[in-house]
Amino acid sequence: MSKVIETKQQVVTEIADKLRASKSTIVVDYRGLTVSEATELRKQLREAGVEFKVYKNSLTRRAAESAEMAELNEFLTGPNAIAFSNEDVVAPAKVLNDFAKDHEALEIKAGVIEGKLVTLDEVKAIATLPSREGLLSMLLSVLQAPIRNLALATKAVADQKEEQGA
């Protein structure tokens, strides 16, 4: 087998592994971004723990098929970049959506969230969600509210009995 074919097979395997392992994958069209804008986008994604790479569409199609995500192939036309996140589901959608608001050249095409294909509208909806830490803090405050109210009610009853006894 030729060296070129081996290299391409390694890339296909790499992409397929990333597709399987990532919790969130977003496909974007980066055509029209300047080098400085692309660098800024990569920096923001890196800070959010997201890997951002450009692959040949033919190799990405093969990887999507081997990862059983063939429905992603219809979005793999033109110059594409793919953002992979293995930790936070919301991070790539949030960073890319915010960047796309400021830079019209960046176009979000579709994504795969936890193995399910999502459209542009669904990616934008996911981008508006708070991060996992934000959701956990909201949950914690909801769980603490009844305990706090019970403590305040108990204190109020104790204060009232103290006033009556005095």
Swiss-Prot record:
> What Gene Ontology molecular function terms does this protein carry?
large ribosomal subunit rRNA binding; structural constituent of ribosome
Instruction: Give the UniProt family note.
Output: Belongs to the universal ribosomal protein uL10 family.
What's any one GO cellular component for it? large ribosomal subunit
Do you know which PROSITE patterns this protein is assigned to?
RIBOSOMAL_L10
Q: How does it assemble?
A: Part of the ribosomal stalk of the 50S ribosomal subunit. The N-terminus interacts with L11 and the large rRNA to form the base of the stalk. The C-terminus forms an elongated spine to which L12 dimers bind in a sequential fashion forming a multimeric L10(L12)X complex.
Record-linked CDD domains: Ribosomal_L10
The residues that cross the membrane are none
Matching entries from InterPro entries are given as: Ribosomal_uL10, Ribosomal_uL10-like_sf, Ribosomal_uL10_bac, Ribosomal_uL10_bac_type, Ribosomal_uL10_CS_bac
Q: Name one GO biological process term.
A: translation
Q: What keywords appear on the UniProt entry?
A: Ribonucleoprotein, Ribosomal protein, RNA-binding, rRNA-binding
Function, as annotated, reads: Forms part of the ribosomal stalk, playing a central role in the interaction of the ribosome with GTP-bound translation factors.
- What is the recorded name of this protein? Large ribosomal subunit protein uL10
Keyword Ribosomal protein included in the entry's annotation: yes
